[in-house]
C-alpha cells in the first residue's frame, strides 16, 4: 500500500543530510489504491467552532478556474480562493530569494504558539523565521547551528523553539533578530541525538520523541520520549536493525511520531508483518502493531480525550481491521489503545497528508491532497504529459486543502493549493495546522506553473498561509 518515492533532487539533498543539513530526503508514505467509493455525507449542519471560511459538507468536484494562467500575488500580499473563498497570504518567493523554501512536513507545527511567527527551511537546509506576511524575523545568518533534524516550537512561548546539537537538546529564545541558545538536557549516554522527521512537540508541550546513538557508522537506534519539565526519559526501544543515529532516516527507521499520551509510533523503513516492520507503537514495554502496510498518519486526542491516530485502516493495513467509511478505504480516526474502534473522517479521498494538533478544544484536522499521475493536470504547463484540468481528469478533492472535524461530523473545503504536485515530492502541499487550529500553512509551486522551476532552484515551491479561526 505504501510506496516510498524520492524527490527529484534526492541525490543532492542526501548529500546535505550527510553533513547535517536539510532533511529533505523525506520519503513519500502514501496509498495509491483507488477502489470504487460510495458517497459519505457529513452528518450535521451546525458545527461549533466553525471555520471562518470554506465550503462546508460539499461533495461535488470543483475544477480550479484559471489553472493554466493563474499567477499568485507577491510575497506579503493575498488573494481569495475563487472556489472556496478563503484568503491566502504568500509568505515566500523562491525566485526572488534564489532558493526553494518550505514549511517542511504536515505533522510538524510551523507556527509559533502565539501565532506570530513561522519556521521555514530552504532547500539547502537553512532555517529562518518570518512573520505572517513573510517579513524576516530571524534571518538564516542568525539561526543557531543544529544537528540534522527538525526545529520545534515551544507549546506556549511564541519566542522559543527547540533543536538538537551534538548529544544535547537545546532551547533557542528569539530576541529581536537574534537567537539566544541554552541547554535543556545533555544525553551523555549517546554521541548524537536527533529530533527526526515527522515528530512534533507533545500536545501538553512537555515531551519530545527522539532517538540517540552513535554519530558515525551504523548501529542500533535508541528511540524514546523525553519530558523536559519532569526531566524524565522513558525506557527506549533499542532497534535490532541499524543505521546512523545522526541522520534523520535510513534503512532501519523511516521516522517517528509522538502520540498524545507521550509514547512513540515507530515507522520502520519496510512494511510487513515482522516485529520491526510497518508502524509500531512503543509504549515503553512492548511494540504494538498499528499498521503492517503504512500510510500517512498523525496523532492527537478525540473529543473524549482518547489518544487517536488518523490514517486509512482496513484489513490491508492490518489483518482484522475494518474501515468505518462506506468505501472501505476512507481516512478514519482510530483509537490508539483500542484499534478496532474507529470513525470515518473522510471517504473517497485522493493521496493525502494529514495534520492534527487536536483535542476537544481544537477538533479540526487539516488534510491536503496531491496526485503524481502522468499524464495529468498536476504538471507544469510546459512539462511533457501536462493536461489542462477537465471533468474527465479532475477528481473529487484533488489538489485541495480542507478541515475535517475529528468526530467525522463536518468537512470544510478551504482552497485549492494550485501546486503541480506531480513535479516532485516537495511540490505536494503538506498542509499543517497551527497548535490552536487558527491557521493552516501549506506549500505550493503555483508561481512557477507556467514557466517551470527557475534555473538553479530544485523542487521550487513557496509557503502560503490561510487563517481559518
PLM-predicted stretches and their roles:
Residues 340-419:
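Loop/turn-rich, solvent-exposed surfaces of beta-rich toroidal or solenoidal domains
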Residues 98, 105-107, 122-166:
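Blade-loop segments of beta-propeller domains
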Residues 108-117, 122, 149-159, 164, ...:
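Blade-terminus and WD-like Trp-Asp/Gly-His loop motifs, strongest in beta-propeller folds
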Amino acid at each position: 500500500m505504501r510506496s516510498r518515492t524520492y524527490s527529484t533532487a534526492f541525490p543532492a539533498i542526501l548529500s546535505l543530510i550527510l553533513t547535517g543539513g536539510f532533511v529533505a530526503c523525506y520519503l513519500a508514505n502514501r496509498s495509491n489504491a483507488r477502489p470504487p467509493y460510495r458517497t459519505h455525507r457529513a452528518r450535521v449542519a451546525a458545527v461549533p467552532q466553525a471555520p471562518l471560511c470554506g465550503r462546508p459538507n460539499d461533495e461535488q468536484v470543483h475544477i480550479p478556474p484559471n489553472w493554466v494562467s493563474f499567477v499568485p500575488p507577491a510575497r506579503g500580499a493575498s488573494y481569495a480562493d475563487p472556489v472556496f473563498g478563503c484568503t491566502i497570504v504568500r509568505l515566500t518567493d523562491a525566485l526572488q530569494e534564489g532558493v526553494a523554501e518550505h514549511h517542511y512536513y504536515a505533522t510538524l507545527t510551523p507556527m509559533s504558539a502565539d501565532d506570530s511567527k513561522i519556521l521555514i527551511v530552504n532547500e539547502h537546509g537553512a532555517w529562518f523565521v518570518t512573520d505572517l506576511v513573510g517579513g524576516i524575523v530571524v534571518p538564516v545568518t542568525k539561526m543557531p547551528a543544529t544537528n540534522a533534524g527538525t526545529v520545534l516550537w515551544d507549546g506556549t512561548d511564541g519566542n522559543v523553539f527547540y533543536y538538537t546539537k551534538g548529544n544535547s537538546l537545546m532551547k533557542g529564545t528569539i530576541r529581536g533578530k537574534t537567537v539566544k541558545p541554552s541547554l535543556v538536557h545533555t544525553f551523555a549516554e549517546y554521541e548524537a541525538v536527533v529530533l527526526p522527521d515527522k515528530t512534533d512537540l507533545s500536545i501538553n508541550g512537555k515531551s519530545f520523541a527522539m532517538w540517540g546513538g552513535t554519530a558515525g557508522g551504523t548501529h542500533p537506534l535508541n528511540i524514546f520520549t523525553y519530558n523536559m519539565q519532569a526531566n524524565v526519559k522513558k525506557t527506549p526501544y533499542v532497534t535490532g536493525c541499524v543505521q546512523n543515529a545522526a541522520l534523520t532516516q535510513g534503512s532501519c527507521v523511516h521516522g517517528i511520531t509522538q502520540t498524545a499520551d507521550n509514547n512513540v509510533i515507530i515507522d520502520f523503513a519496510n512494511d510487513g508483518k515482522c516485529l520491526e516492520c510497518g508502524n509500531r507503537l512503543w509504549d515503553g514495554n512492548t511494540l504494538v502493531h498499528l499498521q503492517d502496510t503504512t500510510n500517512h498518519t498523525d496523532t492527537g486526542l478525540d473529543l473524549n480525550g482518547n489518544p487517536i491516530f488518523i490514517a486509512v485502516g482496513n484489513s490491508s493495513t492490518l489483518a482484522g481491521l475494518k474501515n468505518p467509511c462506506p468505501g472501505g478505504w476512507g481516512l478514519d480516526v482510530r483509537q490508539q489503545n483500542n484499534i478496532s474502534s474507529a470513525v470515518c473522517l473522510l471517504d473517497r479521498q485522493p493521496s493525502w497528508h494529514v495534520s492534527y494538533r487536536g483535542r476537544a478544544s481544537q477538533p479540526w484536522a487539516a488534510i491536503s491532497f496531491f496526485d503524481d499521475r502522468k499524464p495529468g493536470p498536476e504538471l507544469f504547463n510546459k512539462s511533457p504529459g501536462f493536461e489542462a484540468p477537465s471533468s474527465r481528469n479532475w477528481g473529487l478533492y484533488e489538489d485541495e486543502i480542507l478541515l475535517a472535524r475529528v468526530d467525522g461530523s463536518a468537512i470544510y473545503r478551504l482552497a485549492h493549493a494550485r501546486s503541480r504536485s506531480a513535479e516532485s515530492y516537495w511540490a505536494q502541499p503538506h498542509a499543517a495546522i497551527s497548535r490552536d487550529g487558527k491557521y493552516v500553512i501549506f506549500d505550493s509551486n503555483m508561481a512557477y506553473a507556467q514557466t517551470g522551476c527557475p534555473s538553479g532552484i530544485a523542487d521550487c515551491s513557496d509557503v502560503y498561509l490561510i487563517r481559518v479561526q
